[in-house]
Amino acid sequence: MSSRSRGAGALVALVALFTAGYLAPYLLPTVVGRLSAGLGLTPAQAGLVGSVLLLGSSSAGFALAARGERIGPRRAARAGLLAMLVGYGSAAATGTVPLVVAGAVLGGLGSGTATAVAAAGIAGRPDPHRASALGLLSVSATAGALYLTLPHLGGGHAPPLLAIACAAALVWPVTGRLPGGTRARARTNAMTGPLPYRRAGAVLAGGILCWSLAQNALWGVSGRIGLTQAGLSEVTVGAVFAVALGAGLAGVTAAGALGSRLGRAGPIGAGTVVIAGCVLLSSAAGDLLSFATGEILWNAVYPVVLSYLLGLAASLDPRGRWAVLVGSASSLGVACGPVTGSLLSEGVGYPGMGTVLCALLLLVAAPMTAVARHVSGRPLVPGSIRRRGGAPAAVLAGTASATPSLVPQVGAPEQPVAPIRIPAVAGRRRLAKSMFGLAGVRGRG
């Protein structure tokens, strides 16, 4: 098999794994709503179960940040998919709340493992931003189809959990295209070194934690806003979510086509401000028009900004360590979102919750944009490789005509320049530095 075929197969496996791992957060509103209706839980209790599920997901990501390469991508991916299958399947099969919670935690650990493996693999791709966009495109399409299908599969808490378990089973066969443990260990030994961009990475991780928390606090109660405050039926709410995720598909497609042409700072900063406005609109929705407008516009912009954030994290370290850590911080924010949204909505109502979340988003927009401006270097140009030490050679003054896809970007490994010793030639004068110019030897002995 050619190297191009192997690379395409690995990309397919990573996108499929990303889809399975991210499916639980995308289905969070219907999972929380059905836990509340099917098991007789209060909104806060159902939100807490959703938070516990996603907390397990983020914990797995943090645990694998330093050990994933030693285990091997294929083995770690299969372990995560097996945990998803057993955890979500067992939670769907029982109506006992403690067993449902235990199954959700196990399934969340599996989702986090799958997402961490996919994030590390995407960070090692030649164009991590477009690989992230493909993953978001796939998970948005899958979740949109499920939002149209699940209302017709009966009530209870089981259908969405079974859907996630089935996704894990369907992805299992393509994990054979991922590298095994031996190759992963060889890659780990070949690429060692301290974690780069520590300050920028820490700011980005903290910012994306709050960014994800704010949005998933609303996402976790969006179903209840549509059902209770806007007075819509479950079928109508599901249709709105499906259309919203369809708008997300269009947004991710556009982001993938644009790539890094717009930079990262602009889409991250401006996109977060737009999202903050959508959060205000959705939380105050009282009818179908305002609810649908807020949700559709929000879901169209959210995956675009997320793809740039994930691409930024991947560019910080070619080994994928920052990609996994930032992704896990995002999962931690997602995990805290449902219970935060439930507590805020019960305390100050949905509009008050939206105001608080909007303010939080505006606060974190500035530091994340600053990180994007600071570390998103311009393309490498000829003659600018540093001879020894320091930051990667990609942090250089670029030209507008440089082709980004053909030159290293920020985070790429530095290309070492080795000195070459020229031995003295017998019977001739010893070579001296003054004998050489830009075009070669200027004199002869």
Each PLM stretch: what is its role?
Residues 59-75, 123, 250-264, 345:
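Helix-to-loop junctions at the C-terminal end of transmembrane segments
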Residues 29-45, 220-236, 282, 311:
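Short amphipathic helix-loop junctions that connect adjacent transmembrane helices
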Residues 97, 125-180:
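Helix-loop-helix hairpin linking two adjacent transmembrane segments in secondary transporters
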Residues 103-138:
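Cytoplasmic helix-loop-helix junction between adjacent transmembrane helices
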Residues 75-90, 266-281, 355-358:
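Structural signature of the two symmetry-related core transmembrane helices
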Residues 18, 316-358:
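A late C-terminal transmembrane helix in Major Facilitator Superfamily
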